[in-house]
Amino acid sequence: METEVHEAAGAAGHAGQAVGMPQLNFDYWPNQIFWLLVTLVAIYFLLTRVALPRIGAVLAERRGTITNDLAAAEELKQKAVLAEKAYNEALAKARAEAQAIIAETRAAIQAELAVATAKADAEIAAKSAESESRISEIRAGALQSVTEVAKDTAEALVAALGGKSDAASVDAAVAARMKG
């Protein structure tokens, strides 16, 4: 019995070796091809009914989001361009107003300066005329004083030298000398 068990075990072992890999055994190929086709059809239906619609929905949503974002960006760009244009116009208007205010202020200051200069010139002219008249008075007074001192000195010199002083001749001599 031991021999029979050994032989049966040996035959089973040799039978397994004779068969080889079941994937390469042509006896099993129709069954393997059937299950391959069933698996591929199942994967195809799973992809077409579940996965691809979800992927398509996600892609469509992304495309819509991108399109909306691009449209919003374009709209914001247009608004930014309009805002920049309005800003530049307001800035130009403000500059023009500032230049006008500067021109008005400059004109007012020039007018005030002209009035003040004219007033100062008038005051200076009046003081200058007054000073000229004073100088003329002082000069006339000094000339009169010099003439009198010269007459007195001439009379004193003539008297000191022992001569007779004639007032008319002294006046004529002093007047001739004063003229030049």
UniProtKB/Swiss-Prot annotation:
It is a single-pass membrane protein. The chain crosses the membrane at residues 33-53. One of its GO terms (cellular component) is plasma membrane. Keywords: ATP synthesis, Cell inner membrane, Cell membrane, CF(0), Hydrogen ion transport, Ion transport, Membrane, Transmembrane, Transmembrane helix, Transport. It comes from the Bacteria. It holds the Pfam family ATP-synt_B. Gene3D superfamilies: 6.10.250.1580. It is found in: Cell inner membrane. F(1)F(0) ATP synthase produces ATP from ADP in the presence of a proton or sodium gradient. F-type ATPases consist of two structural domains, F(1) containing the extramembraneous catalytic core and F(0) containing the membrane proton channel, linked together by a central stalk and a peripheral stalk. During catalysis, ATP synthesis in the catalytic domain of F(1) is coupled via a rotary mechanism of the central stalk subunits to proton translocation. Component of the F(0) channel, it forms part of the peripheral stalk, linking F(1) to F(0). The b'-subunit is a diverged and duplicated form of b found in plants and photosynthetic bacteria. F-type ATPases have 2 components, F(1) - the catalytic core - and F(0) - the membrane proton channel. F(1) has five subunits: alpha(3), beta(3), gamma(1), delta(1), epsilon(1). F(0) has three main subunits: a(1), b(2) and c(10-14). The alpha and beta chains form an alternating ring which encloses part of the gamma chain. F(1) is attached to F(0) by a central stalk formed by the gamma and epsilon chains, while a peripheral stalk is formed by the delta and b chains. NCBIfam families: PRK13454.1. Belongs to the ATPase B chain family. This is ATP synthase subunit b 2. It comes from Cereibacter sphaeroides (strain ATCC 17025 / ATH 2.4.3) (Rhodobacter sphaeroides). The gene is atpF2.
